[in-house]
């Protein structure tokens, strides 16, 4: 029994040693997942569930630290009883990743986002947001904070994007994007 236990520990240790990449290496990680998005100060609104998909590049600086940047299509906004505010962006996360345990990283960074779609949907009919509501800012800035776990090159990533800038170009409208994002990706060594 002791030999079996020792063999299992050795096997797990050898698998775990591949969970983090070598210093100086680059990886590409295509990923797909979902957003649970809302707008701060949007009274009586609910979260909009949407797609998050794209890719990130990562450079392993030291055994414990890496930097990453990427581009993700991100469906954001919020929902009301009979309407949906659709604010879709191309997010460009720039992150510092600290590996606190084998395969487990804590992330913090800055994320500019570029608006690619803004619509209101009311009772199934879709309207141009710029004509129907307040003008949306073309560029949004947020602070992503998150964690990820990598096993056999599969990466489960959860992060919260704190909106820093207002989503709309209006003195009366002070809403900011607030997005919880969870994705599953796969890292390829480059």
Predicted feature descriptions by range:
Residues 27, 45-84, 88-90:
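Glycine- and aromatic-enriched membrane insertion/assembly motifs of diderm outer-membrane
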Residues 30-34, 51-59, 71-73, 92-100, ...:
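Residues on the lipid-exposed face of transmembrane beta-strands in outer-membrane beta-barrel proteins
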Residues 40-46, 79-85, 118-127, 168-173:
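Outer-membrane beta-barrel translocator domains and adjoining extracellular loop/strand segments
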Residues 70, 76-90, 131-190:
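Predominantly the C-terminal beta-signal and adjacent terminal strand-loop region
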Residues 21-23, 62, 101, 151-154, ...:
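Outer-membrane beta-barrel channels and translocator barrels
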């Amino acid at each position: 029994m002791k030999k079996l236990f020792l063999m299992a520990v050795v096997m797990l240790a050898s698998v775990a040693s591949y969970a983090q990449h070598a210093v100086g290496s680059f990886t590409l990680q295509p990923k797909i997942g979902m957003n649970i998005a809302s707008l701060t100060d949007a009274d009586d609104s609910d979260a909009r569930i949407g797609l998050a998909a794209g890719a990130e590049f990562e450079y392993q600086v030291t055994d414990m630290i890496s930097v990453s940047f990427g581009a993700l299509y991100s469906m954001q906004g919020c929902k009301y009883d009979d309407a949906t505010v659709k604010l879709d962006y191309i997010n460009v996360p720039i992150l510092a990743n600290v590996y606190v345990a084998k395969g487990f990283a804590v992330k913090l960074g800055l994320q500019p986002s570029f608006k690619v779609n803004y619509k209101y949907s009311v009772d199934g009919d879709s309207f141009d947001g710029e004509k129907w509501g307040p003008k949306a800012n073309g560029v949004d800035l947020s602070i992503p904070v998150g964690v990820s776990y990598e096993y056999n090159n599969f990466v489960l990533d959860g992060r919260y994007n704190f909106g820093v800038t207002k989503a709309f170009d209006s003195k009366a409208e002070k809403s900011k994007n607030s997005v919880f994002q969870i994705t599953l990706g796969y890292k390829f060594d480059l």
